[in-house]
Amino acid sequence: MSRRLPWRAALVAAFALLAGAASQAASLPLHACRLAGLEHDAQCGVLKRPLDPAKPDGTQIDLHVVVIPALARQKLPDPIFFFAGGPGQSAIELAGTIEHLTSRLGARRDLVLIDQRGTGHSAPLKCDEPTAEESLARMLDRQRAIAALDECRVALQKLPWGDLRFYTTPIAMADTDAVREALGADRINLLGISYGTRASLEYLRAYPTHVRRMMIDGVAPPDMVLPDTDDVDADSALAALFRDCAAEKACAQAHPALAQTWQGLLAAMPQPIAFVGPVTGETRHVTMTREALRSLVRPGLYSPTLGALLPYAIDQAAAGHFEPLMAFAASGIDIAEGEHFSVICAEDAPRMAPANGPGSDEGARGLYRAACANWPRGDVPSAFYTIPRSAVPVLLLSGGLDPVTPPRHAERVAKALGPMARSVVVANNGHNVTAIACMRDAVFHFINAASDAEAQAVDMGCAARVPRPLAFEPPLPARARAADNDPNRFDDSAPNSPDAPPPGMKDAR
């Protein structure tokens, strides 16, 4: 009898382990739910996670998870995990868009969306939504924007989950792996866009045995210092726009010397201007700055479709009509600012280049340096900044015209990942090339391929066939054409009267 006790003890221990595993798998109960933009029911659930990983019994946060079930009855065991951008974007709020982008993949695979901690409904770190007028004021006045961020930081730190040190990418990827385990998936496919590519790379680094395939679009590697590269990459994309306009006959005729026009416009700043609010119809007077002018152009560079309007908008601004350019301020993504700065201030800001001369702290660099000065910084392991070789296929997509994550970042990452990685550039597209139909098909074949060799051999030829949209000239109303002949219109060769600034810019409401 005594000789059999160890076997019984081992059996009891084994059952205990199985019970523990079952308990873990059951820790994410799912229920049917309806989400905006989805054609079918989804499955929603909440996973409890410790705010501080070192204190598993301490403050807990709710991690919100959505599973969009595969349509087929006999689904495949490797779901797709999607990582949103920002940092600070909610993946769940993008459910309809992501379901559309992955519709063919969703036939036989579940799609898993997680509101990363700090985003969406997962311990949200959102600042108060400013009015359109206040947003404009912050864009025109950096100190006002920094003061608003400081106020937001103080308010966020009063929340039960307000220790801003615990929202880094490595901690978020530990959350992701807990979701994978709770769902009972052994290996998963990763799809990441923009900041989601950094998250995907960190998951691959930390949990390589649980990754089957990975596709990342608009690559932002962990060692990329966003505040340092942001303005440089945007300027390169704008220079490409000027070159393409000069090379296209119709654009060159409509907008001769576009690059010089832009430089002259920048040189004229700061400049008092006026704009008409499209909602109220009232004229307001503001001072346009170089920094604000550059920020207005940037959204138009993300998409070549929007970029097709930029030559016209720049020429109109140079003529004193800022309405078209100001319209770009309305395009952007909804992010949780607290999560955004918790990530950037911990992972990027400590590695920023020092300010070393006039203008070196303009634009994004100056904003992040000031905002991060008082922002709590989480610990980031040195291994986070490394990119080990990958044992699984990785597809890296880039837009040749991308103003924030151009191909140079993806090419460097692909080299580090090794022979299992493949970098593909869509030369005539900007940020997020997965939105292009033929690239969605290519991604489907990459993920769906039966073998790694087949995945690496998927035809990506359509990337070279995507054209750049032609420059677009919107029809002008009669009153705008008459204004072009007004002798009192904006002239950057002489100062404007503060009593009667020139007609111009409309606000984004």
What is each stretch, according to the model?
Residues 10-20:
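Bacterial N-terminal signal peptides
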Residues 1-11:
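Bacterial N-terminal signal peptides that target proteins for export
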Residues 26-291, 342-344, 348-509:
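Gly/Pro-rich cap/lid or specificity-loop segments adjacent to the active site
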Residues 276-296, 301-306, 331-338:
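Structural motif
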Residues 314-351:
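Long, low-complexity segments enriched in small/aliphatic residues
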Residues 21-25:
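Sec/Tat signal peptide C-region and signal peptidase I cleavage site
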Residues 240-244, 292-297, 309-312:
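A general alpha-helix detector
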Residues 306-310, 325:
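Solenoid-repeat scaffolds in large eukaryotic assemblies
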